[in-house]
Amino acid sequence: MTAISDRFETLKQNQECALIPFITAGDPDLETTAAALKILDSNGADIIELGIPYSDPLADGPVIQAAATRALQNGTKLESVLEMLKVTTPSLQAPIVLFTYYNSILHRGIDNFLEQVAAAGVAGLVVPDLPLEEAAGLLKPATERGIDLILLIAPTSSSERIEAIARSSQGFIYLVSVTGVTGMRSQVEGRVLDLLQKVRQVTDKPLGVGFGISQPAQATQVRDWGADAAIVGSAFVQRLATGTPAEGLSAIAEFCQSLKAAIKTS
């Protein structure tokens, strides 16, 4: 059983929904990123998603795009992120999932990339622009190294595609709550419930909902609809980038606690 599967199994036994915060590596710097990972880990995060800054982030909304731009301007590179993780992950309880684009993987070579991320203690990968037809080439070598390849299902995915993705995805399945990019929205769209029900009919794997969740009430809503995890990105990235690094770290600690409290079953 992988670290992510093990975490979901424990949560299931406790009838708990997972909280998965997202932050961008290197914004404002890697020292703050390491501190943020530890703070999220100790304030309610069950799994943590770490975005690798990329120059052409097609799936990211304005908040995360701006964070990636700042990180790249600071000289953040995948190799330096992995060096930071190698030192940081041994002290974390929450498994780390890297959010990275496919070109970054191909540029380094799949085997070389996976060796590096495995050595850094990474538990899973989300690759938003990975075509399902090419997923097998990454899935097999990742699985051999104990790394879960987490695939995405969008509201526009056909029934056939949903079944294929559900079969292949490891760790959990990432349900995209909206058509479009990441970002904060005032409410979770009702069709998320339809998507959850549709996917649940074909798999018993954990289902995480992301893209657009920014408030505790929204996290509670997706939990009540049957999601196994609430994934929150832009709202964390924005808080971490506000004020000094110390103020940002304090803000994400408080926010993480409020989200976890909101999705804990009474």
Curated annotation (Swiss-Prot):
Catalytic reactions of this protein: (1S,2R)-1-C-(indol-3-yl)glycerol 3-phosphate + L-serine = D-glyceraldehyde 3-phosphate + L-tryptophan + H2O
Domain of life of the source: Bacteria
UniProt pathway: Amino-acid biosynthesis; L-tryptophan biosynthesis; L-tryptophan from chorismate: step 5/5
UniProt GO molecular function: tryptophan synthase activity
GO cellular component labels: cytosol
Keywords from the named record: Amino-acid biosynthesis, Aromatic amino acid biosynthesis, Lyase, Tryptophan biosynthesis
Its EC number(s): 4.2.1.20
Active site location: 49 (proton acceptor), 60 (proton acceptor)
HAMAP family with a match to the protein in the record: Trp_synth_alpha (MF_00131)
Function statement: The alpha subunit is responsible for the aldol cleavage of indoleglycerol phosphate to indole and glyceraldehyde 3-phosphate.
Subunit and interaction comment: Tetramer of two alpha and two beta chains.
Family classification: Belongs to the TrpA family.
Protein name in UniProt: Tryptophan synthase alpha chain
Species in which this protein is naturally found: Trichormus variabilis (strain ATCC 29413 / PCC 7937)
